[in-house]
A protein has these predicted regions:
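His/Asp/Glu-enriched, well-ordered alpha-helical/loop segment
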Residues: 259, 342-344, 348-438
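Bacterial N-terminal signal peptides
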Residues: 33-44
């Protein structure tokens, strides 16, 4: 959880009876055999359940857009690509990609296409957008789906919910989400010293609270049984206000997680803790170091383990004037006024916090560290907007627009092991954003969204917008 929110305090079986039919023993034997086979297939399918896949879709040829593939290479002007059954099946330049028989053609001349975003750090389900209240009572399937729809609206294809999930719901949702909204991945319950993880009361009890190595290992074992996507730990004393998870415990967590082939990502604040976590085998950081600028020793520890990643999660800020119009697409007008007031006041602490982390991010990026993308969204912040604000912050910190886009697409998909996502390339899931202008020229152009496609289906943004803000059009 970030030190402040993006806006501070913003708030069926069908039974048919049939007459008996006389069958021979041979016939009944065949029937029993077939039923047995069907049961085996059904059980196997259930055990290997994956997120829902799109229904069969006809081919569509998209032509004329500038294409940013997500691999960091120069964009392709006047591109052409074919989407069929939820995947990119051919990508190239207009004139070299033929129109498949029976396919539709969509002209994107003047537009820019880029991969949909991947958010590696969210806390969904607690914030009720209508009431502007955070509460554990809001952690329902309906609210989680609403949050994922807001992600889809803003061009986010998948998110990792990082350590504050409860009960069976997150795992059910992980298996159920797919082509209709953003993919949901979960770290389940995180691990911290008791009552020393997230700040707020409404989710302080969500993580495991551990005091001994045995408790720490047991928590990891329970998470491993749920096949979580990551293990999240908090190593932070909140400016001396709570006990910090000690090295003996986080080393036990990392060791046990690795024994179960799980990776561990840390919420961290202090440079000294970051160094020791790297020595202990941490797999990634959910925030940048915040007390000091990183030094050569820290960079060297990172470079010695090139698979370790950083999610910068840059300091929060209130939305500026240009953001308010973007936010008004998905929020009712009565919520915009207090945001405008917050924006006018600004945050006196942000320049110092941002400068420290920006310099560190620039140095780590130059050193070749794996830079991912995350927002900490859900802590009362406008869902979806946070991703576009983070992209702008990363560029403000010194990354080029192309580098920020790679971090938010291909690299984050790789970190989350979503191998079929994060790029516009043959065989990949057709998750992409159509923009009215190029973010390579101005990163804030990621907000100029003309359309979003997930698994080849266009998200009905007008319908979603009308339901949230009462506005059916921009």
């Amino acid at each position: 959880m970030a030190e402040r929110s993006r806006i501070e305090r913003f708030r069926t079986s069908l039974h048919v009876r049939r007459p008996p039919v006389n069958r021979s023993e041979a016939e009944m034997g065949v029937v029993r055999m077939l039923v047995g086979c069907l049961i085996v297939v059904a059980v196997s399918s259930t055990q290997g359940a994956q997120p829902t896949s799109p229904k069969t879709q006809g081919a569509v040829l998209f032509e004329g857009a500038q294409l940013i593939a997500g691999d960091g290479r120069a964009p392709t002007d006047n591109s052409a690509f074919v989407v069929e059954n939820g995947r990119f099946v051919q990508v190239g330049r207009k004139g070299t990609v033929p129109l498949p028989q029976g396919a539709r053609r969509i002209d994107l001349t003047g537009k820019t296409v880029m991969p949909a975003l991947i958010d590696l750090h969210s806390h969904l389900g607690y914030y009720d957008v209508k009431t502007m209240i955070n509460s554990a009572q809001n952690y329902t399937r309906a609210n989680l789906i609403d949050h994922l729809n807001r992600y889809a609206y803003h061009g986010i294809a998948a998110t990792l919910s990082l350590g504050l999930d409860r009960g069976e719901l997150p795992f059910q949702l992980r298996a159920a989400t797919g082509s209709d909204t953003a993919l949901f991945r979960t770290a389940g319950r995180g691990i911290a010293w008791p009552n020393a993880g997230p700040r707020a009361d409404y989710w302080r009890d969500a993580p495991y609270g551990v005091r001994t190595e045995a408790e720490a290992r047991t928590a990891v074992q329970e998470l491993a049984a749920r096949k979580v996507d990551f293990v999240k730990i908090w190593v932070d004393d909140r400016e001396g206000t709570v006990p910090k998870l000690p090295p003996a415990l986080y080393r036990a967590i990392i060791d046990e997680a690795h024994a179960h082939k799980l990776r561990v990502v840390a919420h961290v604040y202090y440079l000294a803790d970051g160094k020791d976590l790297l020595r202990a085998g941490i797999d990634g950081f959910a925030h940048g170091i915040r007390d000091l600028e990183v030094d050569e020793e820290f960079i060297g520890l990172f470079k010695a383990r090139p698979e370790v990643f950083l999610i910068p999660n840059l300091p929060d800020r209130a939305p500026g004037a240009s953001d308010l119009a973007f936010l008004s697409e998905t929020l009712p007008s009565e919520q915009i006024a207090p945001m405008r007031e917050t924006s006018a006041k600004g945050s006196p602490a942000r320049p110092r916090l941002f400068d420290v982390q920006a310099r560190s991010l620039a140095r780590l990026n130059a050193a070749g560290v794996r830079i991912g993308f995350g927002t900490d969204a859900g802590v009362g912040s406008p869902l979806g907007w946070s991703a576009h604000a983070e992209l702008a912050d990363m560029v403000e910190a010194g990354l080029t627009p192309a580098q920020a886009l790679v971090a938010a697409t291909r690299m984050s998909a790789a970190i989350l092991r979503l191998d079929q996502h994060g790029m516009v390339a043959n065989g990949k899931s057709a998750d992409f954003i159509v923009l009215d202008a190029s973010p390579l020229e101005n990163i804030t152009n990621t907000r100029r969204i003309a359309a979003v496609y997930l698994a080849g289906r266009e998200v009905d943004r007008a319908k979603l917008r009308a339901g949230w803000s009462g506005r059916s059009s921009d």
